[in-house]
């Protein structure tokens, strides 16, 4: 069985730890903070088998160099660091071109890891899918999606469609605890969504207890996330009201997605 554990970092980051059965060697996803990772490894008597990086932002990559140095000093081995080839991330020594390398077979993990190209938040953003668990970095959040720092709306829209097409039971391990803020916007865009209202109540209760709202599931996100709900009439109506100065009488789904993301940016 693959066990997935969250390490809290910074204000709202999650660094994910992947451990197969009782193996002592584990993988971490997007270790922005070296100290919390080392504290976790030492507290649980674990060793680091490798690092999986989704994109180049510092809060996801800041711990790479120190973790590589730590493994070299303590074991004499070179730590495997996987990441997107197109983003030229310092410390990544196994660069992945997702159009070429779509499956990784990693030591200490029983199941293959699928690599998905999901540009939008950054130009070369990738995601990892293993044992029904999706590590999607800053592409898909519960109730929302990442800002478009480098990619285009068309790229992000395509990436989200790709993720939305995964099986409903796929667990979504995003990299930030943004859920409540996202749901506040989601309810403004989709005010009559009863499932969204119920999920907001559930998420609010979890956060009040200091618990994570992550993982979500693809099935849940399809029902509550406005960025996965396409041309849902209530969302279209909300966008038209927000952008009432524009003629939206005959536009496509991408235009609505673009406007929805612009609205979220200023919400």
UniProtKB/Swiss-Prot annotation:
Cofactors required: Zn(2+)
PANTHER family: HYDROXYACYLGLUTATHIONE HYDROLASE, HYDROXYACYLGLUTATHIONE HYDROLASE GLOB
Species for this entry: Shewanella oneidensis (strain ATCC 700550 / JCM 31522 / CIP 106686 / LMG 19005 / NCIMB 14063 / MR-1)
Subunit structure, interactors included: Monomer.
Entry keyword Nuclease: no
Gene3D superfamilies: Ribonuclease Z/Hydroxyacylglutathione hydrolase-like
Protein keywords: Hydrolase, Metal-binding, Zinc
Function: Thiolesterase that catalyzes the hydrolysis of S-D-lactoyl-glutathione to form glutathione and D-lactic acid.
Disulfide bonds: none
Alphabetized NCBIfam families for the sequence: GSH_gloB
Family: Belongs to the metallo-beta-lactamase superfamily. Glyoxalase II family.
Pathway noted in the entry: Secondary metabolite metabolism; methylglyoxal degradation; (R)-lactate from methylglyoxal: step 2/2
Enzyme class (EC, first level): hydrolase
Cofactor annotation comment: Binds 2 Zn(2+) ions per subunit.
InterPro entries in alphabetical order: Clx_II_MBL, Glyoxalase_II_hydrolase, HAGH_C, Hydroxyacylglutathione_Hdrlase, Metallo-B-lactamas, RibonucZ/Hydroxyglut_hydro
GO MF: hydroxyacylglutathione hydrolase activity; metal ion binding
Protein name per Swiss-Prot or TrEMBL: Hydroxyacylglutathione hydrolase
Top-level taxonomy: Bacteria, Pseudomonadati, Pseudomonadota, Gammaproteobacteria, Alteromonadales
Record carries keyword Hydrolase: yes
